[in-house]
């Protein structure tokens, strides 16, 4: 696919503080590329930087993940009745939802900590 040639230039005025904040938010990416993606609603690649978590919380999350994997393997092995599997799958889905909410909360907290 041939990249489109960009022929129009967009100029905006910002304060020194706004410029610094924009540079910080683009996390080392080219500012123009980042702004284009954000303004046009295109996905912006994460920097990979995750918030710092307390080691006990990390250990607990790792243990939860291990338990979920073991449970999923057992469910998939066919050792349980279909009724049991339905209940376990429903519980796993609820746990997955809770973990997603926790992950979002951790990311939001990390974003606040970086501000």
Curated annotation (Swiss-Prot):
Molecular function in Gene Ontology: DNA binding
Keywords per UniProt: Conjugation, DNA-binding, Mobility protein, Plasmid
Keyword Cell inner membrane: no
Keyword Ligase set for record: no
Domain characteristics, as noted in the entry: Consists of two domains: the N-terminal domain, which contains a predicted ribbon-helix-helix (RHH) DNA-binding domain, and the C-terminal domain, which comprises a signature shared by nicking accessory proteins.
Function in brief: Required for efficient mobilization of ColE1 plasmid and is thus essential to promote the specific transfer of the plasmid during conjugation. Probably functions by inducing DNA bending, helping the MbeA relaxase to melt the DNA around the nic site and cleave the phosphodiester bond. Binds specifically double-stranded DNA (dsDNA) containing the ColE1 oriT but does not recognize the inverted repeat (IR).
Listed name of the protein: Mobilization protein MbeC
Organism: Escherichia coli
Lineage: Bacteria, Pseudomonadati, Pseudomonadota, Gammaproteobacteria, Enterobacterales
Gene: mbeC
């Amino acid at each position: 696919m041939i990249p489109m040639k960009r022929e129009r230039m967009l100029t905006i005025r910002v304060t020194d503080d706004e410029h610094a904040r924009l540079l910080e938010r683009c996390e080392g990416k080219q500012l123009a590329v980042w702004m284009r993606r954000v303004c046009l609603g295109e996905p912006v690649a994460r920097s990979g930087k995750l918030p710092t978590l307390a080691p006990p919380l990390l250990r607990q999350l790792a243990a939860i993940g291990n338990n979920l994997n073991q449970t999923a393997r057992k469910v998939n092995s066919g050792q349980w009745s279909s009724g049991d599997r339905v209940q376990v799958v429903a519980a796993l889905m609820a746990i997955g939802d809770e973990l997603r909410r926790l992950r979002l909360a951790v990311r939001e907290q990390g974003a606040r900590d970086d501000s």
